Amino acid sequence: MINWLHLPDEIWLLIGNFISDREICCLAFVNTRFLNLLSYNKINQNLVLECAIEVDNIYIINKLIDKTDVNGLKFVMRWSALHGSFQIIKSIIRKDHNNDLLDLHAINWSIESNHLHISKYLIDKYNIVIIPESAFIYGRLDIIDWMFSRQNQNNANKKSTIKKTVDFLKSKFISHDYFYDSMIELACLYGHVHVVQYFIDNQCSVRQKWLYYSCLSGNFDLVKLLCKNGCRIFSNRRLINTAITGGNLDIVRYCLLHSKIDLAQNNFAMKIAIKTGHIGIVRLLVSHGSDIHFDNGECMIIASRGGFANIVKFFLENKVYMSEKVLKIAAIRGYLDIIKVFIKYASACMSNINSVCKSNGSMVVDNHINYIVNITRNFNMRKILIWSLINNRINIVTYLLEIFPKLREILNQIMYQHPEISEKIDLDSLYKN
């Protein structure tokens, strides 16, 4: 069996022309004899450093960092922080006598990847005063608490320490309310209950604005915590709309329960629910009086644009007006599920009509049902077929031909009458199906 590691260098240099730069780096780290591959192939130094950090190869890094400029070293710091390579960071920091390598990205990356020992080391080294925003984004209470304690380490009263530090930061950055306004809002936006609870426990007054970010986060426990500690659900549309955007059904139900908003006068709330695709919220709003029949079936068009077949089905069952535009949008964008929902619903309507006619001899057909059934006539299906063909939606065309075999004759006519369509579609794929 051939030992590939002992092939002559000339062979490896030749192989280097046929493999990726990252694979060359990996070869170099397997055996230091292959390091000449790196220089021979003129590989980007950042890629070499990146790979070396990933495998924690101190030898390669020490060999390269002496020739690396400040920006390159910052890159090494960031990548090492992300991968938790503490020894590499300490090795570089020892050579940084003028704080040239101060880089908040490295601190944020270490917090993001939860290598908090690296975060604390860098914060201490460069005497960072402001708590990095990533601690609030990722809910690293360890870092937040440690930095507060670090600000007033001689004070034995923890609650007093927190409040004094908050007041200090507020006074220092009052021009844009850097800490107190923005950072805790981030914790609310990302739904970190434990971080918000920490500030409440340490006598920080709760702001009404936090409730909006909590509704947006979709964390129901956080919303209840803030309401329990002074936030109020006013009867305004903005909070309801924010909760709907967040997409948590329990939060929306909770807000509706504690407010007196007339949803019949608030079509915007329904539009948001449809655009975000939350069928549960759509049903909830309807049960609370929200209108779905406004603007000649605008609801149906919005649902079709988003490709939400379950919402389209719900609207059909509730007899929302449906124009051909709904099917046109679905055909153009390739939303086969919406086409299927419509045809299935139309077939059910037709079956009901036929069964009643057989038993009673006649029946009064609802206008909505009559309209839906008429859309499925060949002429209207022809339109859907053309829209699908023009936009190369072969899956929809295939489905239509399966359900309506007579459309194949119409398809041939369309191809003959409109040769420009045949140029835009994959005919082989179509006829294969």
UniProtKB/Swiss-Prot annotation:
UniProt xrefs under PROSITE patterns: ANK_REP_REGION (PS50297), ANK_REPEAT (PS50088)
Xref: CDD domains: F-box_SF (cd09917)
Listed Gene3D superfamilies: Ankyrin repeat-containing domain
Keywords, sorted A to Z: ANK repeat, Repeat
UniProt KW Cell wall biogenesis/degradation keyword: no
ANK repeat intervals: 44-70, 71-101, 102-131, 179-205, 206-235, 237-264, 265-294, 296-321, 322-351, 380-409
UniProt xrefs under SMART domains: ANK
Pfam family for this entry, one: Ank_2
InterPro entries: Ankyrin_rpt, Ankyrin_rpt-contain_sf, F-box-like_dom_sf, SecEffector_AnkRepeat
Name this polypeptide is given: Putative ankyrin repeat protein R784
